[in-house]
Structures are given as C-alpha cells and as structure tokens.
Amino acid sequence: MQQYSSKYNKQAILLVNLGTPDNYDTKSIKRYLKEFLSDPRVIEANPILWKIILNLIILPIRAKKNIHTYKTVWNKQHNKSPLLFYTENLADKLDKKLDNYIVDYAMRYGNPSIESKIKSLQDQGATEIIIFPLYPQYSATTTATVYDEVYRVLSKLRWQPTIKGINPYYDNKFHIQTISQQIKEHLKKLDSTPDTVLFSFHGLPKEYFDKGDPYYCHCYKTYRLVKEELQNEYPNIDFELSFQSRFGPKKWLEPYTTVKLEEFAKQNKSVVIIAPGFSADCLETLEELAISEKENFIKKGGKEFSLIPCLNDSNQHVDMLYNIIDEEICLKK
C-alpha cells in the first residue's frame, strides 16, 4: 500500500478578523469598502438598487472621507493598519504557544483573504482547519459571513480539509475574566475613580435584531457578566452599555454611544470606555472613540475621558484564546 507523507496530517487554526484596506489611499479604501459593503450579510437591501447607491454615492464619498481617518491611526512604522498589525502578531504569538498546530490569520474582507490562507494551510499539509472568528459576540454580519466565505472556498476544492469552528465566546469564563482584569488594571492606573465605565459595542440595524440576530443579547450578556465581576469591588462606579458606529438613516441598536457620552458630559462626569466587541484596536476605537467621541465629550462639558485599549496582541489575549481553544477541542499537548 502506498505510504503518504506525514506532511498531510496536520491541524491548523485560522484566526479571522474583519479586514482593512491595504493602505490609506483612495483606491485601497474604495476597494476594501466595496467588498465589505457588497456583502448581503452586512447590507440587507435590494441588490440592484444598493449596487447603484454604493458605486455612485457611498464609495466616492466615504473613500475620500476616510483617507484622513485611516491616516490618523495607521501604523506608519510597519505600514499596516493597527487591526492587521495586532492580528498578525496575535497569530504569531499563538503559533509559538501551540507546538502541534499551524496557526495563521486571515481577513474576511481585504488581505490576506480567507481563500489565500486556506490554500496556504493546505500547502503546509493541513487536513483539518479550525476556524476562529475573532468576534466574541455572534452576528450574521460578522461570524456567519466568515463561514459563508469558508464554505464558498471549500466548494471549489477537490480535496477539502475538515473544518471545525470555535463558538462565539461572549460568555466564556476566560473571556469574562480577561476583560474584567483588563478593566481593573486600567482603573488602578487612574488618578481618581471614574463616575462611569461605558461598554461600547459596535452597532447593528435594529431590524436585524428583530429578524432574529442574537447580537444584542450576546453584547448584553458580556456586559452583565463583567459588571457582576466588578460591581462589588467598585460600588461607586456606574457600569453602562451603548452601541457605536451607526451607519445610514435606519434605527440601530440603542442607546447610542454618542448620546450616552453627551449625557455624561452635561453632568460633568468622568468616563472610562471599553469596546469589548473588538479583539484589536481599529478605526472604530482609535479614531471614532479615542479622538472624535473624546473631543465631543470634552467640548460638551465632560470631566475626564479614558479609553481602555483592546486586548490586541497582549499576552493576556494569547492566553485567553489558548484556553478557549483548549476548552473547545482539547488541544494536543
């Protein structure tokens, strides 16, 4: 009987994040936004009408508008967006921690693509690939579309690898403990105790939730579990929930982060804000929260504004992902 090389019996873990433009020029941003906003999971609209609106109105305007915002947060030392930089480092660190697995990363939109990385992992001998979407809270607009793309890629392969997936980890004990500890460590660094810790999650059109998307419930449970971990130790801090990054005229999940921050500002409160739905810092945290929302908050009378960084490529994040993977698939030691 023919002996096959042991090369073709490896397991791999593919971390998947949202995506980023290749650069902060108009062409790169437009290409990225077109792929992202053309996904029917993201924008539920008449496809013909939406294509016209997207190409004639939204892309020309938003591509130019976003040049400055991307340039503001871009990691110019490595010529990468923060999201790409941190996700790449995170995969490298996890790869070093997992001797018996190949660990790599991909982006749902932009580069490196899921298709290119599945091919790369197969070329390295992976016959089983564990997909790990880096979204703690499930949504059809994020987690589901990752698997849509994975299975689209598989449909073209003659030799398909076995695919397994890591569940959303919005209520996983390792995730809750890590976020709670992250907040504690940040609070210790402050000169005074803030009035409020605001949990700001990326928003979602309310109609998506009404149709059955569990995202709001997952966000609320993450918020509630972390709050329960902290409220006894910090009885004088209010813990609140909000949603950011609203896009378009439709009603989105409420309360809106902008509205909550303006309310706190009018009361001359000090605020610490954390965005636990983002695994790595990106435009929504480094520009929208750290710059735009902070400026508006201070302008409206807010006292102190402090943003907790995402877990990024920290050792705590690596350990958390390791423990979640181990809990789900019993890692080979």
Swiss-Prot record:
Disulfide links within the chain: none
Record-level Gene Ontology MF annotations: ferrochelatase activity; metal ion binding
Recorded metabolic or biological pathway in which this protein acts: Porphyrin-containing compound metabolism; protoheme biosynthesis; protoheme from protoporphyrin-IX: step 1/1
CC annotations in GO: cytoplasm
Chain ranges passing through the membrane: none
InterPro entries: Ferrochelatase, Ferrochelatase_AS, Ferrochelatase_C, Ferrochelatase_N
Keywords: Cytoplasm, Heme biosynthesis, Iron, Lyase, Metal-binding, Porphyrin biosynthesis
Chain positions recorded as Fe cation binding sites: 202, 284
Record carries keyword Iron: yes
Protein EC: 4.98.1.1
Gene Ontology biological process terms in this record: heme biosynthetic process
Location of this chain's protein in the cell: Cytoplasm
Gene3D superfamilies referenced in this protein's UniProt entry, alphabetically: 3.40.50.1400
Reaction(s) catalysed by this chain's protein: heme b + 2 H(+) = protoporphyrin IX + Fe(2+)
Major subcellular location class: cytoplasm
Principal EC category: lyase
Protein function: Catalyzes the ferrous insertion into protoporphyrin IX.
Family: Belongs to the ferrochelatase family.
Name of the protein: Ferrochelatase
